[in-house]
Amino acid sequence: MLAGLQLADANEQIIVHDRNLGKLRELKKRCRVTVEPDLFRAVAKADMLIVAVRPASVRELLRSVGKVSRPVLAISLAAGIPLQILSKAFGPPIRWVRAMPSPASRSGRGLTAIASPRTLSPLDRKRVRDLFSKVGRVIEMPESKLDAFTVIYSSSHGYHALAALAGAAQEIGLDRKTALLASAHALADGILAWRDGKHSIESLLDEAATPGGIAATTMAGMETAGYGRAVRKGVEAGLRRVRANART
């Protein structure tokens, strides 16, 4: 996300804290941010606080911060940790929002889902949207939908599909470079044509896979081998994992 903000020439002063001093030095050099090794000073300087730690580390971090006596807008990027837990651990005058920015934010092509309480002011809502819109598209949704979004939106699905398709391409005779090029075109460029156009995914599938043709035969073979079921099982496993974060 820092790389995406840098790419967008964001005007905000960004102060970064991390207990790993080596990481702080690297971020200062690479992303042109102000670093603050002292957690309490970093929090004291912030009028918008972004908590970007692993879900299992959220409670430890909030305990380390202790009580904050002034109003601060706080955004949690921790997957699966609900607003209720955040507010209970680190409540008023902190105003909590949850956001899930994708790794593609580094290139300005991100997608961020935001979930906020009904009590959040329009001004705070705009501040959050404005921040994440600098690194890609922003959508708002009820918190109850955020776990499912977290499982589905990950760029890992694209990388996983690319690796699998390119691997299969190499097995039938293509060299690695050509296999990756052809597979990336099939996935990325095909999806861009859908996203930037006005055609439904169903109509594009019908167009690309004529009955009895090569594409239709390939897709049918994948389905027979359990492609759709494998995707569903993977998504279900991911959903169980993200929901387990609330219990860590």
Where are these regions (language model features)?
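Internal alpha-helical scaffold of NAD(P)-dependent oxidoreductase catalytic cores
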Residues: 30, 85-95, 111-148, 157-198, ...
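Gly/Ala-rich phosphate-binding loop of Rossmann-like dinucleotide-binding domains
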Residues: 2-8
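Rossmann-like NAD(P)(H) cofactor-binding subdomain of soluble oxidoreductases
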Residues: 1-2, 21-26, 30-31, 39-114
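Small-residue helix-packing motif on alpha-helices
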Residues: 14, 24, 42, 58, ...
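NAD(P)-dependent Rossmann-like dehydrogenase/reductase catalytic/cofactor-binding core
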Residues: 184-248
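Short acidic-hydrophobic, aromatic-tinged amphipathic segments that line or gate anion-handling sites
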Residues: 34-39, 139-141
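NAD(P)-binding Rossmann-fold cofactor-contacting core
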Residues: 8-28
